[in-house]
Amino acid sequence: MSFRTISIASFLLLSTAASAFAQSCTPKVPDSELVKPGTLTMSVNPTLPPMQFVDSTGELKGMRVELGKEIAKRLCLTPEYVRIEFSAMIPGLQAGRWDMINTGIFFTKERAAIMQMIPYEDQAISVSVATSNTTVKDKDGLDGLRVGVELGGFEETKTRALDAELKAAGKTGLAIQTFDNFALAFQALRAGQVEGVVSIDGVAKEYDSRGDFRRAVSGLYPAPVAVAFKNAKLADAVSGVLKDMKTDGSLGKLFDSYGLPMIAGDYSVKGPGR
């Protein structure tokens, strides 16, 4: 499996201010539980605006990036991101290349059997089409389309499930083309190489609001999104931070600023041994 990054620099220190803060207080997670001393190393695939993306200056932005920075700050750690494609994230976590997957990984029981996971965000699947395509309005309207999707994620799994549903109903089904990341999938849609892209509601809504693509179908296969860890002690510490952020209102404020729904759960850790 390729660990090719989508930027020249694999590691990005988010801000010197965050680093200075981490150095001015006592870390709440010992170095023995971290990949890099004093640092919360997080993997991200920044191809999902407004959740995570790279702005015109090359800086990481988005709700999940902000959340990761705040988690690190409250743990008195320096935030550091590794930009990597999703298909490499779980193997990289298991190999100890980063502490935390912070890319909006969908929570499933199968994943929670091999990782420590904290569900924190509600999401669902959308299908984006060209703005000129006004015919697709529901799942049945997707039948026969060539659609693009990121390789290896929940979105690909559900795209194949949708294909199976359509075929079981006696329809043609989908022609599915996988891409290393969502940026490439949306580029293919823009170029007319695919007729639709399967992504998450928040991303499809963003592109629709910009006038780039039309969000034709949304709300499919709703499921919680999580952060994920190999280390149980670190997961417990982050769970405590999220609970504190919910109590003091900062988590709700962050979600509201992006128009996103918070989960109804208690931000507890779910994983092996739980």
Identify the role of each PLM range.
Residues S2-L12, A20-T78, D256-R274:
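N-terminal hydrophobic or amphipathic helices and topogenic motifs
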Residues S24, V65-R74, N133-V136, D140-F154, ...:
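Extended ligand-binding regions for polar small-molecule ligands
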Residues T41, L77-T78, A95-T103, L145-R146, ...:
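Alpha-to-beta junction loops
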Residues P46, D122-V129, D201, K205-K243, ...:
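Periplasmic-binding protein-like
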Residues G68-L75, E155-T178, D208-S209:
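Ligand-binding cleft/hinge of the Venus flytrap
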Residues K69, K73, T78-G141:
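Acidic, polar ligand-binding/catalytic clefts
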Residues T78-E85, V149, G170-N181:
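Short beta-strand-to-loop elements that line the ligand-binding cleft
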Residues A88-P91, G104-A112, K158-L162, A188-Y221:
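A ligand-binding cleft/hinge motif common to bilobed small-molecule-binding domains
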